């Protein structure tokens, strides 16, 4: 992880609980382009490293703060972690379940860190572009939970406008046999995603060595195939 994330970085350890450490950080921020922190707002205030503390010393400073749950609200000062704030609280942990009876799945270590970093990067670069136009720095932020919700935004925004969802089904009871995943003879897994089913169905049948299915009246149309999904 260090080799991937920290190329060309230099490190400096500061004890920000002491005035001497804070003074060094303030001197660095006074000549920096971007200051990045993942401390919650309350901790920043205690250490004297909020935007209001640092910006007066450097009007061109881009102050970028990243948190678990955002800059404001009841949860602003809660510590956040990839597996809880990004994965669980956003609803992603539930959305990947096959059905309501399936045990929720854990996320891969750091699963949300990279997409969150890209969103954060976008905020910082936008602020730098703004500074090129105005000469002024600014405060930008992002958080784990917001990025998790964004990852699930197709469903989240649908729910916000009153959409109704079909009950989720396990792969063994799928509504559509040609949009599903299967274990092959060599124990590897294959996932099918026929986005234009009417056009792609004959090709799939040929690839499977089952051209007879193309003319089988039970599976002649998309409606027929869905009605007999388990049989297919």
Can you annotate each of these PLM segments?
Residues 1-56:
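A structured beta-alpha segment of the ubiquitous adenosine-cofactor-binding alpha/beta core
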Residues 4-6, 13, 65, 94, ...:
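Structural signal for conserved beta-strand scaffold positions within catalytic alpha/beta enzyme cores
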Residues 6, 26, 122-125, 202, ...:
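Generic alpha-helical structural signal
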Residues 8-13, 101-106, 232:
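Short glycine/proline-rich turn/loop motifs
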Residues 9, 28, 40, 55, ...:
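Short, cationic motifs built from Arg/Lys/His that form the positively charged side of catalytic pockets
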Residues 31, 45-190, 194-195, 202-203:
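Active-site-adjacent "lid/gating" segments in soluble enzymes
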Residues 178-232:
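Aromatic-enriched alpha-helical interface/lid elements that frame and gate functional surfaces
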């Amino acid at each position: 992880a260090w080799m991937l994330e920290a190329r060309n970085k230099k490190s400096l350890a500061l004890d920000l609980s002491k005035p001497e450490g804070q003074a060094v950080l303030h001197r660095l921020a006074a000549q920096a382009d971007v200051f990045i922190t993942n401390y919650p707002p309350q901790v920043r205030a205690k250490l004297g490293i909020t935007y209001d503390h640092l910006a007066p010393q450097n009007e061109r400073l881009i102050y970028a703060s990243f948190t678990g749950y955002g800059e404001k609200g009841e949860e602003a000062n809660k510590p956040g972690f990839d597996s809880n704030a990004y994965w669980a609280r956003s609803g992603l942990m539930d959305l990947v379940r096959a059905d309501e009876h399936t045990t929720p799945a854990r996320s891969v270590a750091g699963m949300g860190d990279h997409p969150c970093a890209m969103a954060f990067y976008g905020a910082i670069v936008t602020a730098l572009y703004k500074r090129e136009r105005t000469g002024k720095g600014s405060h930008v932020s992002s958080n784990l939970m917001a990025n998790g919700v964004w990852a699930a935004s197709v469903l989240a925004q649908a729910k916000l406008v009153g959409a109704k969802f079909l009950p989720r089904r396990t792969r063994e009871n799928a509504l559509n046999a040609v949009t599903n995943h299967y274990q092959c003879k060599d124990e590897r897994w294959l996932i099918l995603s026929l986005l234009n089913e009417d056009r792609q169905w004959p090709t799939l049948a040929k690839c499977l060595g089952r051209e007879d299915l193309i003319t089988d009246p039970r599976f002649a149309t998309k409606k027929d195939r869905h009605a007999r999904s388990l049989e297919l």
